[in-house]
């Protein structure tokens, strides 16, 4: 069994962030998706709030420095270190990030959780 479907969905998820493409995002996100950030404090952003934020999440550059993918049955975990330059709600959100995505295979692969830890970036602005 290959991971082609998973890899295609992972590429689509990255593309929806870069292009701020809500329609593509809705096809990739699990219905129970949430973004979990940890710096400076734990914050959970549910799917509807993340989709609402997407137009104001402007990525100027995105470089994957490290990538590791583990797959077991219908669960996959992707770990990445990302160097990103971005503006979120008008605030600079550039820096290094450690990102772990949990993917679930149901009708298709969907990202269920993204855990993002900013190593060098400023805190997310208040929403």
Please place each PLM-identified region on the residue numbering.
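A beta-strand edge to alpha-helix "cap/lid" segment located at domain peripheries
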Residues: 1-27, 34-127
